Amino acid sequence: MRFLIPLLPEVAEHWAWFVVTMALISIFYGALLALMQINFRRLLAFAIISQTGLIVIGLFDFNTYGMEGSIILSVSFGLATAGMLLSLGMIYKRTHTAFIPRLGGMFDTNAAIAVLFVICALSTMVMPGTPGFDGIHLLIEGTIKGQGWLVAIAILFGNVLTVGLLLRAFQQIFIATPRRSQEPFANTRHASSLPSPRNEWIIAIIICGSLIATGIHTSPWLHIIDQNIDSISNVYSNTGTHYPDTLTTQPIISKDN
């Protein structure tokens, strides 16, 4: 958005159909592959691929709503992904395994890790009260205007898959009982014997608090974003591509910033 769309608007619009098609494929491809994983690292990696497709579609809507939604989702997914990676790292530190069938029942003694994972997962699911909710609302509105109803509906179905895979991962890791024997890991420290220390609670509170605070009070973020993307979104009109004479001299970021 900082370089391709302002510098090459004709090229961006000409290839928008291809980019949006590949983004839609990545949404479903990443989500379906994530559902098939039994390694939580690979699961999260494919889930990130799926969510990246949403951001790309918003950028190529070529309107203010879509671009605002993409930026808000970028912030939301960045915080949420960091939180989930951190929680999974804590799990691996305890169990020395990333194999989901060997995990389970970790909520009772590792509540901080569970709370961190579920709040970040809810933000990735774009639930109300998280920044992802406002971001997906703007993204869908921009997609309806820029790409049409079919693409917007496809985005919603892709998000349903993301909800399913993250809830399934939470259930298998933190609630369900292990489906495989722990014998190969008998010499390692099991998660149930290591309750969450104070520093893990502090980290969980900071990340979860940032997500919730950003989700409840999104207006300042939108105000900052509006100042920086107006010069980009105004390049395009609803009836076609319009290139104002000031495009080459208008700064992408206002001087007030």
Where are these regions (language model features)?
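Hydrophobic transmembrane alpha-helices and their helix-loop junctions in integral membrane proteins
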Residues: M1-H137, E141-Q171
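Cytoplasmic/organellar membrane-interface segments at the starts of transmembrane helices
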Residues: N110-A112, R168-N257
